[in-house]
Amino acid sequence: GYQKVTDPAARAKFAKAWGVPEENLPLEEGYKLTDLGHLVDEGKVHCFYNYGEDPVQTEPDSAGMRKTLSELDLFICQDIFMTQTTMLADVILPATSWGEHEGVFTASDRSFQHFDAAVPPKGECRHDWEIFADLSTRMGYPMHYDNTEQIWNECISLCPNFVGATYEKMAPEGGYAQWPVKSTDVNDHGTPDMFAGGKFTTKDGRANLMA
């Protein structure tokens, strides 16, 4: 929701919502995928949980990524296909595809749209949120959700730019919400044009262009 982990107000809000001490939330930004190689080499990372990505195929240094993943003590993959990355995993958690679950996606124009499942899950695959909730509960932080709408409502309650992106707006055919959308009024579908009037969110209000 575009809120910095270093923002005291944001940290306090999330800690209260999640029922955890504020000091339990990290004060620094997390690692990036491109940091993984040297972090494993330096012994700072021993386990990696890969979700819905195929970095062996998508990262520029495929051989380097393969070497990094092979040197982990524990490598977990959560995906819908047997990819070049999942072939290296110690544990594979089979997830549902988009046609087997419902939820919300974000388009490149900032539009949130709801989609329904077309068919029930096959075999042993489970919804992503069910896997995460079950794993979290087993690790000591109970997550008791019944459906994706409950999770979505938690998300928008914590993110000011998304607060008006309700299922009520998105569920009807053709329904959508385009963030920032700060009103729950069913007729308010958000902001079609960002930075109207030429005002940007930089310190001087002007666009910063880089060549």
Model-derived features: positions:
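Non-catalytic alpha/beta scaffold blocks inside enzyme catalytic domains
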Residues: 1-162
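Long, low-complexity segments enriched in small/aliphatic residues
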Residues: 1, 13-21, 152-211
